[in-house]
Curated annotation (Swiss-Prot):
L-arginine binds at S252, P253, N254, H263, Y438, D442, Q466. GO terms for biological process: arginyl-tRNA aminoacylation; determination of adult lifespan; negative regulation of gene expression; positive regulation of gene expression; translation. A motif ('HIGH' region) lies at residues 252-263. This is Probable arginine--tRNA ligase, cytoplasmic.
Amino acid sequence: MSANKELQQGYSDYSAASDQAALLNRLITAMQKGELTDELLEHIPELGDAKKLNDKLKYRKSILEKSIAEQAAKNKKNGVKATSTSSPSSSTSAPAEKKAKKDGKTGGAPPKQAKKVDYVTVEDYGSSIFGRLQSLFKKAIEDAFPGLDVPLLLAETPNPQFGDYQCNSAMPIAAKLKANKINKRPGDVAKEIQAKLPTKIDFVEKIDVMPAGFINIFLNTDYLRRQISLLASEGVKLPKLTRKRVLVDFSSPNIAKEMHVGHLRSTIIGDSICRLFEAVGFDVLRVNHIGDWGTQFGMLIAHLYDRFPDFLKKLPDISDLQAFYKESKKRFDEDEQFKKRAYEYVVKLQSHDGDIVKAWNTICDVSKKYNQIVYNYLDIKIKDVGESFYQDKMIELVKWVKTNKPDMLREEDGRQIMFPTGCDIPLTVVKSDGGFTYDTSDLAALKYRMLEEKCDWNIYVVDSGQSLHLETVYAAGRDFGWYDESIQRVEHVAFGLVLGDDKKKFKTRSGETVRLLDLLSEGVKRATEKLIEKGRETAMSEEQLVAARDAVAFGCVKYADLSHTRTQDYVFSFDRMLEDRGNTAVYLLYAYTRIQSIFEKDEVKNVDLVKYIASTPTLPLDHPGEFKLAKQLLKLSDCVLLVLDSLMLHQMCDYVYQLATLFHDFYNECYVIENKEGEKPFVHMHRLALCDVTRKVMSTCFKILGLREVNKM
C-alpha cells in the first residue's frame, strides 16, 4: 500500500513538473518571438503596464511627428529656414505645448494643485492638543500679519527644557517681510504672534518667546491629568468632524482569477482607510471595482458549458480557478471551433441572452465565493460594483460628452479621444470599432460617483503604476465640471510592491504569482508553530488558542503592510512579522494581553475602579513613566487628524507602537498591584485607571488597523 502511494505521488510530482516545464517553455517561446501572450502578461504584470504606457507614448510621438511635419511644410511655404537637421522625432522644431511635469513617484502624472486643500473640517477638537494649537497659532498669525501666506511650522520639542511644543513660523515670516522691504527681527515677529494668542489657554501653562524667534509652549500638567480622568470615565472620543460621504474603491480582483499577493496591499490599505472614516462618523461606501466584464468571458462560458453542462442546476465545483482559466485560454488559442463559439457567446452576453447571462453569473458566483474566503479571513466588508455595472453608463457618458462638451473630443484614426487640461497623453473614449476602453469605464465610474452617488470624497486605492492614468481621468472630471477640487476630494492612494527576500516581486519558488489563500494559510501554520514553540497551547483553551492564532496570523500580515510607508515597496517576511519585539503586530498584541491579564487578577474589581474614577476628577500622575504614557494617550486625536489628511496608515502604526513601548516601560517601572510580604496586595487605582485608558486607546487603534483583540496570547 505504501509503495502504491509513493508511486502515485511520484506520478503526481512528475505531472506537475511536466506542466511547469511546458509553461516555462511557452513563456520562453513567447519572449523569444516578442509575443505578449496572456500567460506572459500574467506572469510578468509589469509588461502589461509597460505595454499600455508604450502604446500611449507611441501615439503621442505620432502626434508630435505630424505636428512637426505640418510646421515644416508651413515653414517651407513661407520661406522660413529650418533651424535644425535633427530627426522628425526631435522636439526642436515642434510647436510649443503645455506638458505635464514628470514625477518618478507618480509615474509621470500631471502635477496636482500647488496649494494644499484642508478637506477635513473640524467642529470640535476634543482631546486633541496639537490640533487646537494649530488652530490657535494659524489665527494668531493671520491676525498679526493679514494677507501674508506662510506655512505654520509647529512641532513637538525633542528637549523638554524647551517645552512640549514649539512654533517656528517667526523666521520664515521675517524673511518674507524682508522681501517686501519690511525689516523685523524674528524675535519681534514671535512677540507679535504671541500677542494675538488668547491670554488664557486652558491646556497651556506658559509660552516663552526666544530672541531667535522660537515660541516654546509648555502644557498645563493638571489639564493633562483631568483629560486622562475624562478618558477613563467617558471613554475614547475622537474629534467631531463635518460629516462626509466617502467612496473608497479598493481590492478590485478580476473574476475567474484567484486573488493573489498583488491584491494584498489594496485590500488591506483600503479596508483600514474605510475603518478610519467610519471611526470619525463618515458615511462610507466600500466599493469593489471587480473585473467582471470583457471578451474573455466568451471562452470561459464556452469552457463552462463543456466541463459542467448541468451548471444551470448546480453550482459547479471548480476547485482551481486559475487552472479553469488556463484550460479555457489554451482551447481558445488552439481550437478554431472553440474560438468561434467563444466569440458567439460574447455577442450573446452583450445582448443579455438569458442562458448566457446565467453562465456569466455562475462564473462570477464561483469566483466571488473564493474571494469571500479571503475577505472573511481578513475581516473585510466590501460591496461588488464591477465593470458590468458601468456598461450602460458608458453609453450614457459618450452621449453626455457629445451633448455637453463636444469641443473636448477629437477624432484620430477613427477613435474619439480627448486631452484633459495639463495632460499630454489622451484618453480614448470610443475605439475605432465603436467599442469602449478602460478610459471610458473609469470616466463613467467617476461621473456616477460624483453626480449620482454625490460623494464628497472619492478615494482610489490602486498601485502606483496607475497614477498617470488616474490623474488623467481626474483631470477630465474637472474639465467636465463633475467636481470642484477645492471642495471635493478625489485622490489616488498609491502604494508600492510586495517584494520577496531577493528584493524582487514576491513569487513562489517556481516563479508563480503567490495565491492569497495560500499566503494566509501559511500565516496560520506559522502562527500556530510560534504559539506552540512558546508553550502557549498548555496555558490556553483550544478556543483561546484558535483566537490567538488567527489574531497573530492575519494581524501580522496586515500590520506588516500598514506599518510601512505605503508609497514604498516592502519585503514580505513571515519571520520578521512574527517577531515579538519591535514594531510588529505580535508586540502590540502582547502589550494588550498584558493589560488584560492585570484586570483578570483577583485583587482587581471593576466596580472599585468605576467608583474611584467617578470620585477622582484629576488623576494623581506624578511618576515620569505615568506622565509619559498619559501624554502619548492624549495624542490619539492628533494622530487621527494627521492620518485623515495624509491617508498614510504607518503614522497610526507608529503611534500605537510608541504607546505599547511606553506602556511596557510604565509596567516595568510602576507597580499597578504591589505585593509586600505579610501584607494584603495593594492596588494603585490611578495606575489601574491608566491601564484601562491604555487598553481603550489601543482597542480604538486596533479597530482602525483591522487587528483582532485577544485576551490571552
